[in-house]
Amino acid sequence: MPRTVVSTASTAWNGDLISGSGSTTLETSQLGTMDLSWKARSEDAEQGTTSPEELIGAAHSACYSMQFSNMLAENDTPPTSMNTSAKVSFNAGEGGITGIALTVTAQVPGIEDADFQRLAEEAKQSCPVSKALAGVEITLEASLG
């Protein structure tokens, strides 16, 4: 029986939304603390400052890569390499997160493009982070490289 694993991150925020700032800490992995600001969300990204949307993109690209690589391996065509990006679109008005564009390029010896495309789409649908983001349109561009 699979066990439930809990991962924890925490955020400290000071001030109001527009002029305030904060930091998010990756508690479980203890990999670090990242600065946050409204400007990083609603305007041009500030160097050294992240946003919830960038963190969602990181989670989604990592989860998708793991899911897709597992599905390829189960197909007896494990990837030798894979690069995935997730571009999260955010409308600072009432739209919120309006879409996520996944792009993956992989080296997969012995696979036909049709099978690669089918498994890429199945991985998008079955990735746990994709499921958590089901209310957002997620597009996929997959290519053998």
Summary of predicted features, one role per range:
Residues 1-58, 65-145:
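Extended beta-strand/beta-hairpin segments
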